[in-house]
């Protein structure tokens, strides 16, 4: 059990981080990100739910890719968010 925990920690720090870095530099991510921004009209969806209009270029994974790698390109798992809302969402989960 201790070895599994150590491996999980190593994996999270080294392998998963690099995989995430590679993903966020991929053409697949660039295409998905653009589709989300167009779909959401470059408006922060969190702000819109609170009746505010904020333009943005940031896309947020609702379920983080570290928890659901298989949903990394699922447009239903992404929304445009302003940097402030994106940072708040990341702190929450």
Across the structure, where does each feature detected by a protein language model lie?
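Short Cys/His-centered divalent metal-binding micro-motifs
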Residues: 2, 49-52, 78-93
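Short cysteine-rich loop/turn motifs with clustered Cys
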Residues: 28-58, 82-84
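Alpha-helical hydrophobic packing sites
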Residues: 62-63, 88
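A boundary/linker detector
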Residues: 1-31, 48-53
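Generic secondary-structure boundary/loop-capping signal
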Residues: 20-21, 59, 70
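Short linker/helix segments within small regulatory modules
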Residues: 63-78
